[in-house]
């Protein structure tokens, strides 16, 4: 009996690319997704055979693609970043936008909450990283000097409380590590041969993984600022995430979702979507467009590491679960 991931169901409500997925830390039956359809959807997870979740609320207000969404640790608020240049804080119970964060001069590509939810960080095509409080006040802007020289595509807080850290990825081909206390540069991690789309920090804060255009994932020791090793994903990488329960790294590439066991550095899963099988399952056959090419653009694990949520270019969220087969 092998352990692997099987497609559990789909979640359909977005009409364009699913750009981000946020999962609650208490493993409750909800997730939040963001999309190029300019909306954020709060889902209730029914975990039924075909339809894994149903839309509970659609949050609207952004005037352009919503590129990223994250949840506060109590699950009460969602934070989004959009190509309209703004961040928004959403009250999920009310379904309303509680705050707008205005200051970036170009598209916001990435947002994150600090561990205590008191600080917010954002990354933009204006090449800056901004640090905000929850009132929507910009407290610091990382720009010029040591800052990135091209679009900042992704920004994440390290979960390590000993050394509060921000990690950013950029189209300038670098990953940068910043001290949160003074917003000063600690390390520039160079090694990619193309733009970097995404960066992920391991659950214990010791490692970070980066990926993008060159199709190679680089693993870094965050404390030392040193490159540890690389994993060849074979095509453009759009998202990365570490499993919260296994020593696994998951990558959304333009070919498939690949999962590595970091101990053996071998691929344990290579998840592809069969659109014909899916069409037969959801509509009982019919005119599925088999020529359509879709790929995964966003990924996140459930807090217990049992379920992998993946968002695709066709607007569908697909749910994979660990099972035996």
UniProtKB/Swiss-Prot annotation:
Signal peptide: none
Keyword list, A-Z: Repeat, Ribonucleoprotein, Ribosomal protein, WD repeat
Superkingdom of the organism of origin: Eukaryota
Sequence ranges of the WD repeats: 13-44, 61-91, 103-133, 147-179, 191-221, 232-261, 291-321
One BP annotation, GO: rescue of stalled ribosome
GO molecular function: protein kinase C binding; ribosome binding; translation regulator activity
InterPro entries, per database record: G-protein_beta_WD-40_rep (IPR020472), RACK1-like (IPR045223), WD40/YVTN_repeat-like_dom_sf (IPR015943), WD40_repeat_CS (IPR019775), WD40_repeat_dom_sf (IPR036322), WD40_rpt (IPR001680)
Record Gene3D superfamilies: YVTN repeat-like/Quinoprotein amine dehydrogenase
Record keyword Ribonucleoprotein present: yes
PROSITE patterns the record matches: WD_REPEATS_1, WD_REPEATS_2, WD_REPEATS_REGION
A single GO cellular-component term on record: ribonucleoprotein complex
UniProt record similarity statement: Belongs to the WD repeat G protein beta family. Ribosomal protein RACK1 subfamily.
Database matches in PANTHER family: RECEPTOR FOR ACTIVATED PROTEIN KINASE C RACK1
Protein name, per record: Small ribosomal subunit protein RACK1
């Amino acid at each position: 009996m092998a352990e692997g991931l099987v497609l559990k169901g789909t979640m359909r409500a977005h009409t364009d690319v699913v750009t981000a997925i946020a999962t609650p830390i208490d493993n409750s039956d909800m997730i939040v997704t963001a999309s190029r359809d300019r909306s954020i959807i709060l889902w209730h997870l029914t975990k039924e055979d075909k339809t894994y979740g149903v839309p509970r609320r659609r949050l609207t207000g952004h005037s352009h693609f919503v590129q990223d969404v994250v949840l506060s640790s109590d699950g009460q608020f969602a934070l989004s970043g959009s190509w309209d240049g703004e961040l928004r804080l959403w009250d999920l119970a009310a379904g309303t936008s509680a705050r707008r964060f205005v200051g970036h001069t170009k598209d916001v590509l990435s947002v994150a909450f600090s561990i205590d939810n008191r600080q917010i960080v954002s990354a933009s095509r204006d090449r800056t990283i901004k640090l905000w409080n929850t009132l929507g006040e910009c407290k610091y802007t990382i720009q010029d000097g040591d800052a990135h020289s091209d679009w900042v595509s992704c920004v994440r807080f390290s979960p390590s409380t000993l050394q509060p850290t921000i990690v950013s990825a950029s189209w300038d081909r670098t990953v940068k590590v910043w001290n949160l206390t003074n917003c000063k540069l600690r390390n520039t991690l160079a090694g990619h041969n193309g733009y970097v789309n995404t960066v992920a920090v391991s659950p214990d804060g010791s490692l970070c993984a980066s990926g993008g255009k060159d199709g190679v994932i680089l693993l870094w020791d965050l404390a030392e600022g040193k490159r540890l090793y690389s994993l060849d994903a074979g095509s453009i990488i759009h998202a990365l995430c570490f499993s919260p329960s296994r020593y696994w790294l998951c990558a959304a590439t333009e070919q498939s979702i690949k999962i590595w066991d970091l101990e053996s550095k071998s691929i344990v899963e290579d998840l592809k979507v069969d659109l014909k099988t899916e069409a037969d399952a959801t509509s009982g056959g019919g005119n599925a467009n088999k020529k359509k090419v879709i790929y995964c653009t966003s990924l996140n694990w459930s807090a217990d590491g049992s379920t992998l949520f993946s968002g695709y270019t066709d607007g569908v969220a697909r749910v994979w679960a660990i099972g035996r087969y």
